[in-house]
Regions:
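Conserved alpha-helix/loop element of class I SAM-dependent methyltransferases that forms part
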Residues: 2-19, 34
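Class I SAM-dependent methyltransferase SAM/SAH-binding core
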Residues: 22, 28-74
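Conserved Class I S-adenosyl-L-methionine
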Residues: 28, 162-227
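A conserved beta-strand element that flanks and buttresses the S-adenosyl-L-methionine
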Residues: 86
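Short catalytic micro-motifs in class I SAM-dependent methyltransferases
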Residues: 89-93
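A short glycine-rich, Lys/Arg-flanked "PGG" loop and its adjoining helix->strand segment in the class I
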Residues: 98-110
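Conserved class I S-adenosyl-L-methionine
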Residues: 113-142
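Short alpha-helix
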Residues: 142-157
């Protein structure tokens, strides 16, 4: 497990040796195997995309990880079946965040934890691509919730807020590598820009990368712990 996963999973999450974990909105399984290793736990990765689940299964390590199709708004698990629901960067994709929070509550056993990593509106100015792609700012302001609003959604579903912490994570070792990553098209906000806006942003980013010494690129993420 790489250091990023260790930093994310360690400080805010309780020990869960030999327990049950859900990686909700697991995508291609970036964290699923890491969760199983970190907690020595049974982990179920759930995602609505068959294509992403196929990629996740290709990365599967060992017998303690399995995958199932489903959504946060309709979690395909019985009540009182897991100890931790882990959600990474899915909140802004949820069609019905309040319903998703309500779905989490009964699935958790007594004392269970919902852990959410999310981009929030307060952090937009610190996102490394915003200055290069100014058309992304109004989109981010529309799709990202405020920190307090995220907390209120889960509180309304019966959770209490245990912790909210800002984590700054390295996402690329240099601006040049960051530009390559953005060009791959994984960011849904940039994918929604016009071709002209995207090309102009990439040109500006490449120009900046050529002028500066190699330096890592970081972005802020808010971590929420609910019980």
């Amino acid at each position: 497990m790489v250091s990023l996963e260790q930093r994310i999973l360690g400080p805010l999450l309780p020990p869960l040796v030999d327990r049950d974990v859900v990686d909700l909105g697991c995508g291609t399984g970036r964290f699923t195997n890491a969760l199983a290793a970190h907690f020595d736990a049974e982990v179920i990765g759930i995602d609505p995309s068959k294509k992403m689940l196929e990629q996740a299964r290709g990365k599967q390590i060992g017998q303690r990880v399995r995958y199932d199709i489903g959504s946060a708004e309709a979690i395909p698990l019985p009540d009182d079946s897991v100890d931790l629901i882990f959600m990474s960067m899915i909140f802004h994709h949820l069609a019905e965040p309040a319903l998703a929070a309500r779905e989490c509550r009964p699935v958790l056993r007594e004392g269970g934890t919902a852990f959410l990593r999310a981009g929030t509106r307060e952090r937009i100015s610190a996102y490394p691509y915003v200055d290069f792609f100014p058309a992304s700012r109004p989109i981010l302001e529309r799709v990202l919730a405020k920190r307090d609003d995220v907390c209120q959604v889960f509180e309304a579903a019966g959770f209490r807020v245990v912790a909210v912490d800002l984590v700054t994570q390295q996402i690329a070792p240099s601006l040049e590598r960051y530009a390559d990553k953005l060009l791959a098209g994984a960011d849904s906000v940039l994918a929604s820009l016009s071709a002209g806006d995207f090309e102009a942003g990439m040109k500006a980013l490449r120009a900046q990368a050529a002028q500066v010494d190699s330096q890592s690129v970081c972005e802020p993420i808010d971590d929420f712990v609910f019980r």
